[in-house]
Curated annotation (Swiss-Prot):
One Gene Ontology term from the biological process aspect of the record: lignin catabolic process
Organism (species): Oryza sativa subsp. japonica
GO cellular component entries: apoplast
Protein name listed in UniProt: Laccase-2
Free-text remark on how the cofactor is bound: Binds 4 Cu cations per monomer.
Gene: LAC2
Cofactor annotation: Cu cation
Binding site for Cu cation 3: 131, 468, 525
Amino acid sequence: MASAASSLPLLVSSLLLALFALGAHADVKRYQFDIVMSNVSRLCHEKAMVTVNGSYPGPTIYAREGDRVIVNVTNHVKHNMTIHWHGLKQRRNGWADGPAYVTQCPIGSGGSYVYDFNVTRQRGTLWWHAHIAWMRATVHGAIVILPAAGVPYPFPKPDDEAEIVLGEWWHADVETVERQGSMLGMAPNMSDAHTINGKPGPLVPFCSEKHTYALQVQSGKTYLLRIINAAVNDELFFSIAGHNMTVVEIDATYTKPFAASTVQLSPGQTMNVLVSADQSPGRYFMVAKPFNDVPIPADNKTATAILQYAGVPTSVVPALPQTMPATNSTGSVAAFHDKLRSLNSPRYPADVPLAVDRHLLYTIGLNIDPCETCLNRSRLAASLNNITFVMPRTALLQAHYYGQKGVFAADFPDRPPARFNYTGVPLTAGLGTSLGTRLSKIAYNATVELVLQDTNLLSVESHPFHLHGYNFFVVGRGVGNFDPAKDPAKYNLVDPPERNTVGVPAGGWTAIRFRADNPGVWFLHCHLEVHTSWGLKMAFLVEDGSGPDESVLPPPKDLPKC
């Protein structure tokens, strides 16, 4: 079923890690990303799609903590392009962050741009992806940041490791799918399959037998799997038949280890797990299936890959996991996330802000706005504090840096315009929003608490939110309406999970805290691309401080122009 070539990514990873061990003194890593059209075939369908260097998923970036990374991106396709280095903090250097019209204008057809950044006090698994329209469906890849030379993992050293990139596949051109949905004012068509390392696996009908990723393992050895949810619109469960996983890291921050038979990741999140090849030699399915906790149409397609013990014939039928959570199992997801704790060791402390300077409450809404050219003369929209974000025509960071007027207003409200029973009966009237390019101005070094509150406008739904430029601590979460008088007493201020992307439960809330010590303009958005395209986003404008290293760096000379 799986060819020997399917194990090449693990071999390449092992060789690169060995080279890093030999050349630990190297501190500059250079990469060339060519944005090209490639013909790719899955499920009996071939299509031309945008890729980096002709590969899907794209190449892995390898670096060490403390390295400088230089990536020259050359755009050979007709589409505009940007690349976001998801989870890298880019201190003072928003010019390298990548979201189109937020920190940079796009790289036009035939153009190039050099992303030049330092990996400072970060180590673990992150990822990169296109950050314009829905291009990230095919333009994405892993980032592996090894600990600084001589610094061990804070868990047993694995014998080997591999990246596991979870994604989605559309037969149609993804940009066409998004554009058709936008023109109609409706939700775009769902994907045709989920993938593991770009392949749907043999359980999906239609020519999928040869499109199966296989990870070869040796009995008795332990492997570090670097799992990335690169799906466009789906939260996913991941499980390996017959094998437990030990969670040791989320979003490139170490955790207190714990065992799990199934893990759950929202789009944008990463997770490192240890897996021991301690079962009877055989072939075992790795499974990725959607988590969906609301009664609306959703993907329910399962992707599979194979954990292949060395020496076992490929004719052996792989075993499936005996039990996995139901697609709508909110209880198992909540129980899993309750186990996530920062390592909080002397080397890796959890520096949770205990005092708060700014308290923010953002309500998450799914809305309906008028649209004379759309089906039913209306379009689906989304909002924070009832504001649907409008993307500007020039980059926000450039407008801020150069003092350009009329691009944005720095008046995003700290609270919703009206209080109501956010998670009560579904609200079907008064669903319109206000439109605006509105930012929230934050003083340098201020401590911020942001409560993200889901609402029942149209329907409750879980939302993964990603904050650029920062990690944050997830100090609390709950079901129902956030109670500012009672809920903070239940916060975990000792060892809460530290993340860059967090899920807000359907009909519930999530509270995060961070210190605004990174000046610039930083995007906050839902990482379900369908919701982001509807306007579920905003940005923080973190002011410069007074110190010599507390202001935005000057822009690079090759920064693209709008």
